[in-house]
Design a protein with these regions (language model features):
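Conserved, well-structured ligand/cofactor-binding cores
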Residues: 1-178
Length: 178
């Protein structure tokens, strides 16, 4: 809030008014414009995490493709399969690489599923989730603008109070990474 007051007071000076004449430029109404770190920061983190996820998946898919290529390349090389650290039955080295590719592909699906929660945001919830200091259409306008800017299917959380204190999407994604 202090930054908003500094900005408002400087604006007042530039407009020829005295500092503190907030009827002309209010720290809340004109500078802050319904923004809150309790909704803006988490929303930015969600969007940033989703973009990071997309980059990560791109690289995982490159590794999957490399495993598949090695699977084809070594399809004829026989080796001993292992079971509980002991030799088991014959298999090809190509099958081993294809197995690695399948495992990684399944993990990418898990990450994709977890990353969907990043698209649910609390923008417009303001300080505690009630949206009390924002205009009634503020949240829907923010979501529309974010969709337009990002091209992502961003959606507003059903319960803004809960979403304001909820970090489960970060915990869920971290869990999927393990």
């Amino acid at each position: 809030m202090n930054a908003n007051e500094v900005i408002a007071n400087r604006a007042l000076e530039l407009m020829g008014h005295k500092r503190g004449e907030y009827q002309y430029c209010s720290p809340n109404d004109h500078v802050n414009r319904s923004q809150s770190t309790n909704d803006a920061y988490p929303t930015a983190i969600h969007i940033g995490m989703y973009y990071t996820h997309l980059k990560l998946v791109k690289h995982f898919k490159e590794v999957i493709d490399a495993f598949r290529r090695k699977g084809e390349e070594f399809a004829h090389v026989i080796k001993m399969g292992r079971n509980q650290l002991e030799h088991a039955v014959p298999m090809t080295l190509g099958q081993t690489f294809n197995g690695f590719a399948s495992i990684l592909q399944d993990e990418v699906k898990n990450l994709d599923f977890a990353a969907q929660d990043f698209l649910t945001v609390n923008m417009g919830a303001t300080a505690i989730g009630t949206g009390i200091t924002a205009e009634p259409e503020y949240a829907s306008k923010c979501i529309a603008a974010l969709r337009k800017i990002t091209g992502l299917d961003i959606r507003l959380a059903d319960d803004l109070i809960g979403a304001t204190s909820d970090t489960s999407c970060l915990v869920g994604y971290s869990s999927a990474m393990r």
